[in-house]
Structure formats: C-alpha cells, structure tokens
Amino acid sequence: MKRSPSYFCLLVLLCACVLPLLTGCRTRSFLSTRQEISLGREGARQIEQEYRVDIGSPDAQRVRRIGERLLPHIDKRDVPYSFKVLETKEINAVALPGGPVYVFRGLLDMLGDEDDDALACIMGHEIGHVNGRHAAKQISSNLLTNLIINFGVPGATNQNLAALAATFLNLKYTREDELDSDRRGLSYAHFAGYDPKGMIRFFEKLERLERRMGGERQEWLRTHPLNTSRIQRAETLIENKNFQYGQ
C-alpha cells in the first residue's frame, strides 16, 4: 500500500512523542557508531551539494592541518574525521555525527590568518560534539532518523535526507552539551600545543561583532548559545589548567 506524505509525517510525529515516554530518557543515543558514520556521510553529501567546498586553498590546508593536529589527543578514534571549508559568509562551524567537520568561510574571515589558537579551540569544540555524541543523542529522540536508517519507511525520500542536512546545520545544543564541548575542545587544543585562550578571544570577537550589528545574532551563536557564565567557566578552566587528556 502506498502511504501518503501526510501519513509519513503523522507516523514520525507520533514516534517522536512516544519514544521518550517508552525509554524514559532523552539523552541516550540509540544510534550505533556505524549508524552515526552512515548518517554523517549522508548529511555531508547533502551539505556539499548545497555549499561549495574549498578543497585546495591555503585556508583549506590550514583547517585540515589543525584538525589532524588535534586528533591524536581525543579518545574516540572509531570515526573517520574530515575537515573542510564551506564557501559561505556565515560565521559558523558545524560537526556531523561520525566525523565530518565544516568550518565556514565567514568564520575564517573573522578570525584572520594568524589566530590558529582560536581556530583550533573552535574546531576542538566541534570535535567535542562528535566525541560526546551530542548530535546523535538529539537525533535519536527524533524517530525519523531511526525509521530511515533501520526500517526504510516508505516516504523517506531525498527530500527527507535534504531536510536531515538542514537539521545538522541548524541543530541547537543544550547548555550542558555546550559546556561539555567547551571543556573537551579546550583540552584538545591545550594538549595539541595551542593556546586555549584563543577560545576566549573568539567569544569576545563574537560579542563585539554582535554589538556592532545592533544585536543581530550570528549563526554560531544561534546554534551555540553563549552567556556570561559559559565564558567565566571557560576562563576558570584555563586559569586552573583543568584539562583532561583524551576526554
């Protein structure tokens, strides 16, 4: 029997509401590492159809070099990380489940050519989201993904997969996830030989830019909420050198 899109949407809505009630938990990931990798690859394919990827420029090489320097200092080695630059003026960086990490051109322009420390902290933060499985935990609460991956529900079309890419780009993390990724990213940067104070400089630049633009919230801040307590916590972690290797 052919099911209509409205039937598919209703099924997804019901499952998304019922799943947390059945499990009693919104923070557990129901995706295996293999499923995370598969989901990330599909999301990356969709994103790279929408945005032009910078492959061979000095900026692209810089991003790959910093990413490769961070990787030996993390504990989750079972995913194939990649580091790419997307040609968009948005000030943002995103990481997908399973390892794809994207730095947006607008972010590189804001940081300039010399502050590798700040860029390393930002990329470490994004790696922290992957390592902490933050996106996978959120996506697990949306049974649309599980239906696509596990059951092949009729109606899961390329349009659904394109929407999945948009979900990755606009995924808003919880306060706890942001603090966890800050801790992880600062630790990765520190042990890779970068100055973790680069993260504070980045936060301060974002705040100044936001004030100059009349309070208009930049893309990174929309998906990575920033507040005074978060900045203070990062400053305290750096001051106390409370870095944890591989976490």
Question: Which positions does each model-derived feature cover?
Answer:
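Sec-dependent bacterial lipoprotein signal peptides
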Residues: 1-23
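A Zn2+-metalloprotease active-site environment signal
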Residues: 22-247
